[in-house]
């Protein structure tokens, strides 16, 4: 019998049993949650804010809409969606990790973002929502960490309303060889040291660099989305392909 859980799967460059990956990923985000935002700003020189703003601009979000920000973590996208959907709309910030959710919830409440945001602990692979619930779904820097990405893509499509769109913001493959070299040097020599100094945790940032290299490239992810049933799938590279924004629709 072919038991899926006995197959091995990548956790960064390591091969681990399929049913171990969730716990290992949980350990990473449990460990980095408190320093997650400050590390994001440092590591990306603040550029992650532009990637996220562009994602919102491409989402087509309007007042009154219902949005799911899955793997939403500390809530950067949720905060912007909350303003755009207004009091008649709703944003669900969902994440598998309670520590990340707590940091997100505290941050948004401190900023006065309340009333139209709901917090749900959920796994992207098995979303606990009815079919055809959301107008817009985002997953930013989250899909890379999911064990069964195809299952997560199908789960997101199921809860998306007809006419709605899913946006996947994720690290991808730089388009130029030179940029790739610089990026590799930065990721493997500088990032883990930064993680050690700021978050007292170099392993999690080593995992970050490795998991990015193991993630499907632009065209592969596009094919995976099409295979899952998304229509009119496209993507746009940002920062030379360091990051890509994939978009797919349900009609
Ligand atoms: C790198 S953070 C991204 C947070 C936020 N979206 C952002 O862009 O700043 C990745 C998040 O994915 C969450 N995550 C990992 N696996 C998940 C899964 N299977 N389902 C839902 N969330 C998951 C982690 O807990 C973490 O909060």
From Swiss-Prot:
Superkingdom of source: Bacteria
GO biological process terms, semicolon-separated: aerobic respiration; menaquinone biosynthetic process; methylation
Reaction catalysis annotation: a 2-demethylmenaquinol + S-adenosyl-L-methionine = a menaquinol + S-adenosyl-L-homocysteine + H(+); a 2-methoxy-6-(all-trans-polyprenyl)benzene-1,4-diol + S-adenosyl-L-methionine = a 5-methoxy-2-methyl-3-(all-trans-polyprenyl)benzene-1,4-diol + S-adenosyl-L-homocysteine + H(+)
InterPro entries per UniProt: SAM-dependent_MTases_sf, UbiE/COQ5_MeTrFase, UbiE/COQ5_MeTrFase_CS
Enzyme category, top tier: transferase
E.C. designation(s): 2.1.1.163, 2.1.1.201
Pathway info: Quinol/quinone metabolism; menaquinone biosynthesis; menaquinol from 1,4-dihydroxy-2-naphthoate: step 2/2; Cofactor biosynthesis; ubiquinone biosynthesis
PROSITE patterns linked: SAM_MT_UBIE, UBIE_1, UBIE_2
Pfam name, any one: Ubie_methyltran
CDD domains recorded: AdoMet_MTases
GO MF annotation: an example: 2-methoxy-6-polyprenyl-1,4-benzoquinol methyltransferase activity
NCBIfam families for the chain: MenG_MenH_UbiE, PRK00216.1-1, PRK00216.1-3, PRK00216.1-5
Family: Belongs to the class I-like SAM-binding methyltransferase superfamily. MenG/UbiE family.
Record function comment: Methyltransferase required for the conversion of demethylmenaquinol (DMKH2) to menaquinol (MKH2) and the conversion of 2-polyprenyl-6-methoxy-1,4-benzoquinol (DDMQH2) to 2-polyprenyl-3-methyl-6-methoxy-1,4-benzoquinol (DMQH2).
Annotated HAMAP family: MenG_UbiE_methyltr (MF_01813)
PANTHER family found in the cross-reference section: 2-METHOXY-6-POLYPRENYL-1,4-BENZOQUINOL METHYLASE, MITOCHONDRIAL, METHYLTRANSFERASE
Protein name: Ubiquinone/menaquinone biosynthesis C-methyltransferase UbiE
Organism of this sequence: Idiomarina loihiensis (strain ATCC BAA-735 / DSM 15497 / L2-TR)
């Amino acid at each position: 019998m072919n038991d899926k859980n006995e197959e091995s799967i990548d956790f960064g460059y390591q091969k681990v049993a399929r049913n171990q990956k969730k716990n290992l990923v949980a350990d990473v985000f449990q460990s980095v949650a408190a320093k997650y935002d400050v590390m994001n700003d440092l590591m990306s020189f603040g550029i992650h804010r532009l990637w996220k703003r562009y994602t919102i601009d491409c989402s087509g979000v309007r007042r009154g809409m219902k949005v799911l920000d899955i793997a939403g973590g500390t809530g950067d996208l949720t905060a912007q969606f909350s303003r755009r959907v207004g009091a008649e709309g709703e944003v669900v910030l969902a994440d598998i990790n309670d520590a990340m959710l707590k940091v997100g919830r505290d941050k948004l409440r401190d900023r006065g973002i309340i009333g139209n945001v709901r917090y749900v602990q959920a796994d992207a692979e098995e979303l606990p929502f009815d079919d055809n619930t959301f107008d817009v779904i985002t997953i930013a820097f989250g899909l890379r960490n999911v064990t069964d990405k195809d299952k997560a893509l199908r789960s997101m499509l199921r809860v998306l309303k007809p006419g709605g769109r899913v946006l996947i913001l994720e690290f991808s493959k730089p388009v130029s060889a030179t940029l790739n070299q610089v990026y590799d040097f930065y990721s493997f020599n500088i990032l883990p040291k930064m993680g050690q100094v700021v978050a007292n945790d170099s392993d999690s940032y080593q995992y970050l660099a490795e998991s990015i290299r193991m993630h499907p490239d632009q065209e592969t992810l596009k094919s995976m989305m099409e295979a899952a049933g998304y229509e009119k799938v496209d993507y746009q590279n940002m920062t030379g392909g360091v990051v890509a924004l994939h978009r797919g629709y349900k009609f």
